[in-house]
Regions:
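Rossmann-fold cofactor-recognition segment
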Residues: 42-53
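NAD(P)-dependent short-chain dehydrogenase/reductase
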Residues: 149-199, 206, 212-213
Length: 298
């Protein structure tokens, strides 16, 4: 009989989920979930499940009995959230989160919830702390914040991670802007990038590693800013990538949020991560992380 902690991962085929599968398997007994896309889940103990089906979800808890649940499943693309019926986004991002919290309480499991930096106002200054004003301006961000609230209303055995812009190279259907930028630059295509939108980006595999470290430290109930330590614009991130990967910086085109009037004008949700660092977490610089990504790519 295994004495390893049992970890249930939702969204195992998603952008972060694929890295959590690789990072946590072997160190823990994992069960990773997927729905429409398998991703890399077929390489691990996994199950296809519609997480909005409460009966199936309850059966999964009954059979697997997790010690920790990492809830990474969501309608996580703000643009995708706009294109879907609001009721569907709410069901996945809010109702499912509440159901998971209730099941975690029932089975005495800890819940790690991947929220977003986009819950912050975006106009209150830079390097925001966890108690900064919360003003989500998109349906996606609003439902992620509602997810936080639902969890807190259910129980207090949780860790909420307000996740920054994640970047890296995906091996599944779930891609990201950084990967698209790299491929365009590699092909000699110009890439328009915001000069006036600031985040604290975090590499995907660093995110998975940090979650692993937090689990090992037996985390207590908290809400944490979950990002890198550097505040950069999208354009500056592109410049770092070009510098590390010897790509043509002249292909980077400066654009402003003002150039796209229909785009949510979220100017600055860069986050202060002192609280995260207080766990003894080592955060790599963006240049260090990208250097490792490019090295592995070759």
């Amino acid at each position: 009989m295994s004495s390893l902690l049992k970890i249930l991962i939702t969204g195992g085929s998603g952008l972060l989920g694929q890295f959590l599968n690789k990072e946590l398997d072997g160190c823990f007994e994992i069960c990773t979930t997927f729905n429409a896309h398998k991703g890399n889940c077929d390489k691990f103990n996994s199950i296809k499940i519609d997480l909005t089906n409460l009966e199936l979800l309850a059966q999964l808890f009954q059979s697997f009995r997790p010690n920790i649940v990492i809830h990474a499943a969501a309608v996580s693309n703000p643009n995708a959230a706009i294109s879907l019926p609001a009721k569907e986004v709410f069901a996945i991002n809010v109702k499912t989160t509440e159901s998971l919290a209730k099941l975690c309480e029932k089975y005495s499991a800890k819940l790690i919830y991947l929220s977003t930096d986009l819950v912050y106002a975006g106009y209150r200054g830079s390097m925001l702390s966890e108690d900064a004003k919360l003003v989500p301006v998109s349906l996606y961000a609003e439902t992620k914040l509602l997810g936080e609230i639902k969890i807190k209303n259910v129980f207090d055995n949780y860790l909420i991670l307000r996740t920054a812009l994640l970047y890296g190279f995906s091996s599944t259907h779930a891609t990201n802007h950084f990967q698209e930028m790299y491929e365009k630059l590699l092909g000699g295509t110009a890439v328009p990038l915001f000069i006036d939108q600031y985040r604290t980006p975090l590499a995907l595999r660093d995110a998975a590693r940090i979650i692993h470290e937090i689990i090992q430290k037996d985390f207590k109930t908290a809400t944490l800013n979950f990002g890198g330590k550097e505040r950069v614009s999208r354009f500056e991130l592109g410049e770092i990538l070009c510098g590390v990967a010897s790509l043509n910086k002249n292909l980077l085109q400066k654009i402003s949020l003002n150039d796209l009037p229909n785009y949510p004008a979220i100017a600055d949700v860069s986050m202060n991560t002192d609280k995260l660092q207080s766990y003894g977490i080592n955060q790599q610089s963006i240049e260090e992380s990208i250097s490792l990504l490019i090295k592995d790519k070759k």
